[in-house]
Amino acid sequence: MLKRTPLFPVYARYGAKTVEFGGWEMPVQFSSIKEEHNAVRTRAGLFDVSHMGEIIVRGGGSLPFLQKLMTNDVAKLRPGRVQYTLMCDESAGTVDDLLIYQKGEDDYLLVVNAANTEKDFAWLSEHADGDVELEDVSAETALLALQGPAAERVLQKLTDMDLSALRPFSFQDGVEVASVKTLVSRTGYTGEDGFELYCQAEDAITLWEAILTAGAEDGVLPCGLGARDTLRFEACLPLYGQELSATISPLEAGLGFAVKTEKEPPFIGQAVLKQQKEAGPPRRLVGIEMIDKGIPRHGYRVFAAGEEAGFVTTGTQSPTLKKNIGLALVKAEVAAIGQEVEVDIRGKRLKATIVPTPFYKRAKS
């Protein structure tokens, strides 16, 4: 039986086409992936991401506990700030990538990938000791993401909080949005400005409908996971199971900014990551652009000078750039920009070239 989010009852009203994703029945699109993608790049779009996992970590031992598990330096957080980080196993394979919200002195909220929630909770529980309390609040929490250049203007109609004062990777809890008590976070997964809004599950429909009503004149569209994927891909934001996995390290995925190999005491996987940092990771995530006609897809093999060199992690025809592009994990020695490679597309080796990433970066307003 697939899980459903608190917004499932209103999907049909907005024309949702649903698919299975990580054990959930989720909307892949409402109008079309291209339309929704372009709405977010030029106006704004509203996503239901209530399938994501939320885990609370509390108690006097919270900080040392998180420091032991996280690749980033959690001590740098302050109440009201958000940090991107990862958890690794001893061999530096990625357990998950996540966001940490510091709510109070010994009070943290971890937001993890939907398909990994149970695995992550078990991993955290296995390593918890001392004064640490863990609580999985995913079932009672809804999460909506309003993303795009018009996001602030639209959301401001529904709240007295001055949204312009909220910096990226900051949040405020207990904010009334359309009379719904909400945690408002300036974060997202699209490469655009935007907000992620956490509320009680029973308030999700009220909040969803209020935002779409407030955004009607700005052309805000309900958006599905299809556009979420093309948007995050153009911005080169990793997706667990594709750019990250138990066999892909954060350094191979190009996430060195979130890996603090000098941290003391060391975190799980730190020794291997330190070696990778010093020697250079054996593989690197690169951007590829097709020269021949064809679309690189997840799992397609990549060749360089006739030898197998890696595989495509994500690929599509970019709605913004109108090019056939992909991300690929390849041997470090063939990862140079300008390197010509071949992608095996249905038995044919088609030419591509390694290009700079991210493919898309929004202009700073």
Swiss-Prot record:
One of its GO terms (cellular component) is cytosol. It catalyses: N(6)-[(R)-S(8)-aminomethyldihydrolipoyl]-L-lysyl-[protein] + (6S)-5,6,7,8-tetrahydrofolate = N(6)-[(R)-dihydrolipoyl]-L-lysyl-[protein] + (6R)-5,10-methylene-5,6,7,8-tetrahydrofolate + NH4(+). InterPro entries: GCS_T, GCS_T_bac, GCST_C, GCV_T_N, GcvT/YgfZ/DmdA, GcvT/YgfZ_C, TrmE/GcvT_dom1. It is an enzyme of class 2 (transferase). Keywords: Aminotransferase, Transferase. SUPFAM superfamilies: Aminomethyltransferase beta-barrel domain, Folate-binding domain. One of its GO terms (biological process) is glycine decarboxylation via glycine cleavage system. Its EC number is 2.1.2.10. One of its GO terms (molecular function) is aminomethyltransferase activity. Belongs to the GcvT family. The glycine cleavage system is composed of four proteins: P, T, L and H. The glycine cleavage system catalyzes the degradation of glycine. This is Aminomethyltransferase. It comes from Geobacillus thermodenitrificans (strain NG80-2). The gene is gcvT.
